[in-house]
Amino acid sequence: MHETRVLIDADACPRQALAIAQELCREYGWSCFTYASFHHQLSGPNHITVDAGPQAVDTRLANDTRAGDIVVTQDIGLAALILGKQASSLTPHGLIFDPEHIAFHLEERNEKARFRRGGGRTRGPAARTRVDDQRFAEALRFLLEKERGEIV
């Protein structure tokens, strides 16, 4: 059995979600790793800095992920790769990706991209709220407890 870990795509992770994840990892005794390009001002013993190339962070994070890990990302394509490795994935807003629904999320992403390529405009993300923080904390806690075998 390998060390249980939470891996965070820190390029687009709100600082509050990052702080929540680090606190919960301390509480549960899990290692927490952050991944970001060198353009981001992050550091620490468990921070991995990668090149600034397109998809560099996602590629490194996907390559480092092992079965049983939990990955925090807003990238639906990366989440699909993570699920294929028998790991869990959730967004900083608390949406847990699951194998049964990932195809829907990928199709929705593709439809929005097609719409934008055709000249359409889509809304950006809403401002982060305390409800988002609570939802993320609850979802991450659920996955941590599930991985520990406390939830079936």
What is each PLM-predicted segment?
Residues M1-V152:
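Nuclease catalytic cores that cleave nucleic-acid phosphodiester bonds
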